[in-house]
Amino acid sequence: MADVVITNGTVVTMNDDRELIEDGAIVVDGDEIVDVGPTDRIDEEYTATDRIDASDHAVLPGFISTHVHVSGILLRGLGNYRNLYDWLLNVKRPGTSAMDAEDHAIAAALYSAEALSTGLTTFVENATGSGGGYDASLLEGKFDVYDAAGVRNIYAYAFADKAPSQEFVESASDIAMREPEVNHVLPDETVADTQEALDTVESLIEQYHGTADGRQSVWPAPYLATIVTPEGLAGAYELAEKYDVMTTTHTAEDAYNEQSRRLSSVEYLRNAGYLGDRALLGHCVQVSDADIRTLAATDTKVAHNTLANCALGAGIAPVPTMVNYDVTVAMGTDNVPNSDSVNMFKDMEFAAHLHKGHNRDAGAITAEKVLEMATIDAARAIGREDSLGSLEAGKLADIVLVDLDRISLTPRTYLPAALVYQTTGCEVDTVLCNGEIVYEDGRVPGLDGLYDDLQSTAAEASANVIDRAGLGSQRDRTWTSINE
């Protein structure tokens, strides 16, 4: 007897043939998918403890976001109309620095709830909050929340072992002058010792990687090419190889970092021994064709944060060119205060339209490719293609049910396109992760025991953080038709 059988749905398998099974069914036993096929056959061959009727539903693999920052969700709404470093120095760093361990745990709960409600079951959390260092209470508080919620979290522990340039330090002070009321935490020459940083990452991998029934992972994450030494980069990649994990870093997000270097970030990472099939580069907005060829030749993966990059005015990553060179590109949802949501449907639609307009080519990217970038390509980007990203026997049971009986989805001429162009995320009504139902009827049952009212708790925590950080004037701003 199986644990769960899902029947009567349209199964969007994302397998090698990209098979769509009308009136399809999925059999789940434990944390694994054991069979996928037509409902008639599955009904004849299997009994189950629980049966889910997916009539008028699309059944998808759980979405994977390959680049996120979690704690900033409590700063939602404060990032509007600010370029990257204005936002980073005058909003994010002050805000996250004002958070204590409980605030971070609340943020993790809110993030997990919103992620699951829109079908996002796996996310790579870039842990790049201000101050650096290892805070055990912060980390364990977050991990406890992720475990309770039932999400699949990849904690990419960040470090910087190289001081920023004096030019950048001075520029940061100039940028901070815009907001004199803010309690700034500006960059300085304080850096981690390379070996100590690598030792910390290794100890975290040994302690936490594979916990929470395999849903918790830990990666090494050198913060940014400009503030990590070649030794730090090479050491991170070696750790990834040693522990059979991936490693990730922010790369070529804005023009400043590229213009201030003799080498491009991609060239520097290549020369330092960081590129390869275990490397996932976040952003890659300011990259050349030569950089893209290097990414392709080394099988280096890219996380595309389309909404966040545009919200910050950072630019548009040349994704169609990357795809044409066979670079694995996956979707990322990045910082919540940039896009103000945790919603892969929103990011997919934006990406699908953005590259058409930017390239003046309606065929620059397809809805199908964007759907791949949120599922099977994303699984490949995080080194989990063998276990995630598609609905196939032998893979982990991360499954999303999308209600198609909606006005906005009527008519739906072609389902893959409708899922990208006509779906907003509110149509998700059931989510399984690791074979367990983690979202149903508008609730994340695993979080019920942690917070009586998560929304009220998060709103109160956000207000307190904003006050402590001196961000009140940004919260209480007036109507703005033309930004200063």
Residue map of PLM features:
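Active-site microenvironment of metallo-dependent hydrolases
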Residues: 1-24, 28-30, 39, 45, ...
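Glycine-enriched alpha-helix->loop->beta-strand junction motifs that scaffold or abut catalytic
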Residues: 240-246, 274-277, 294-303, 324-329
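Divalent metal-coordination and catalytic microenvironments
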Residues: 9, 26, 31, 56, ...
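Alpha-helical scaffold segments that flank or form the walls of functional sites
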Residues: 79-152, 198-211, 455-463, 467
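Metal-coordinating catalytic core of metallo-dependent amide/deamination hydrolases
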Residues: 137-284
